[in-house]
């Protein structure tokens, strides 16, 4: 019989030890080992292999398949019934401003601190829809403001018509007077040498009176239109509304809005001069045709 190797001996020794432990002698062996030491006083030691195991979970404690809630296939929380939310909100009046602020809140979050582009956009939208952003205006106040705006528009058109009639009457009388005083010679000549001659005194006084009337009429026009009611209404034209809506999308456009409004006011004065000048050209054309 061949000799066992060291590895086989250790294996047999381990199997014998496990067999003894399985027979319930683990506690005796442990006490025997501990009794040989001088530091251990107690011999009532029980091995963990001889301790009976207590069942931590019984069959009754296990949840049945019927009572166990199914595990969701995703990690999202369960969504509550939307009908309960609708029942809670059905008696509440909808706040359009709050809803728009919530919608615009996400876009305003990444515009940087201190940026109120969402609030400006909301205010411009409210103004474009002719609503009060504070939400405190009643139907009677809105109707009154609408009627007042219409009255100011009518009054502004009435003043423009008055200036138009006064200008035409004054310029017509000025032209007729100098035409008769010049011996019916106040007309345009088709010949270059005639136009190159010295200006007649009647022609000079005619144009002096024309320019004087223009300066007086345009100054009076600006003075009347500078009233607050007309000044505020002049900002409600189509160009100003387009710029107001564009500034809500592109805030840089808002800085040019006062300049455009001022340019429109100056254009009204320039249009008065151009219109009166075209009227004089028409009169000179008639006299030239009749003179020939």
Swiss-Prot record:
Q: Which Pfam families match?
A: GET2
Cytoplasmic-side stretches of the chain, per the record, are: 1-158, 226-268
Q: Which domain of life is it from?
A: Eukaryota
Span list, region Disordered: 1-80
Q: Which lineage ranks, top first, belong to the organism behind this chain?
A: Eukaryota, Fungi, Dikarya, Ascomycota, Saccharomycotina
Family assignment from sequence similarity: Belongs to the GET2 family.
Sorted alphabetically, which keywords does the UniProt record give? Answer: Endoplasmic reticulum, ER-Golgi transport, Golgi apparatus, Membrane, Transmembrane, Transmembrane helix, Transport
Protein name, per record = Golgi to ER traffic protein 2
Membrane topology, from the record:
Multi-pass membrane protein
GO cellular component term of the entry, any: Golgi membrane
Q: Which InterPro entries match?
A: GET2, Get2/sif1
Q: Does the keyword Metal-binding apply?
A: no
| Bias kind Basic and acidic residues: ranges | 1-18
The listed locations are: Endoplasmic reticulum membrane; Golgi apparatus membrane
Lumenal compartment residues: 180-205, 290-292
Biological process annotations from GO: protein insertion into ER membrane; retrograde vesicle-mediated transport, Golgi to endoplasmic reticulum
Q: Where is the composition biased (Polar residues)?
A: 29-47, 55-71
Protein function: Required for the post-translational delivery of tail-anchored (TA) proteins to the endoplasmic reticulum. Together with GET1, acts as a membrane receptor for soluble GET3, which recognizes and selectively binds the transmembrane domain of TA proteins in the cytosol. The GET complex cooperates with the HDEL receptor ERD2 to mediate the ATP-dependent retrieval of resident ER proteins that contain a C-terminal H-D-E-L retention signal from the Golgi to the ER.
Quaternary arrangement and interactors, per the entry?
Component of the Golgi to ER traffic (GET) complex, which is composed of GET1, GET2 and GET3. Within the complex, GET1 and GET2 form a heterotetramer which is stabilized by phosphatidylinositol binding and which binds to the GET3 homodimer.
TM region(s), chain numbering: 159-179, 206-225, 269-289
């Amino acid at each position: 019989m061949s000799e066992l190797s060291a590895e086989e001996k250790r294996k047999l020794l381990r199997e014998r030890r496990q067999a003894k432990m399985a027979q319930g002698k683990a506690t005796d062996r442990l006490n025997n080992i501990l009794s040989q030491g001088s530091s251990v006083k107690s011999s009532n030691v029980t091995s963990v292999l001889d301790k009976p195991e207590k069942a931590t979970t019984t069959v009754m404690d296990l949840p049945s398949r019927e009572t166990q809630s199914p595990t969701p296939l995703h990690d999202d929380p369960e969504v509550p019934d939307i009908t309960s939310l609708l029942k809670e909100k059905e008696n509440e009046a909808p706040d359009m401003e709050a809803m728009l602020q919530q919608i615009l809140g996400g876009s305003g979050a990444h515009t940087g601190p201190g940026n109120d582009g969402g609030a400006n956009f909301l205010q411009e939208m409210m103004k474009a829809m002719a609503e009060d952003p504070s939400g405190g205006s009643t139907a009677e106040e809105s109707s009154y403001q609408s009627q007042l705006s219409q009255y100011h528009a009518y009054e502004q058109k009435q003043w423009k018509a008055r200036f138009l009639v006064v200008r035409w009457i004054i310029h017509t009388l000025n032209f007729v007077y100098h035409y008769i005083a010049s011996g019916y010679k106040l007309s345009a000549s088709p010949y270059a040498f005639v136009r190159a001659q010295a200006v007649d005194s009647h022609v000079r006084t005619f144009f002096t009176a024309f320019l004087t009337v223009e300066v007086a009429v345009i100054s009076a026009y600006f003075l009347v239109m500078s009233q607050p009611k007309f000044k505020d209404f002049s900002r409600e034209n189509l160009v100003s509304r387009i710029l107001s809506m564009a500034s809500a999308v592109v805030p840089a456009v808002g800085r040019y809005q006062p300049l455009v409004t001022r340019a429109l006011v100056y254009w009204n004065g320039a249009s008065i001069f151009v219109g009166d000048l075209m009227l004089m050209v028409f009169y000179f054309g008639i006299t030239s045709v009749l003179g020939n």
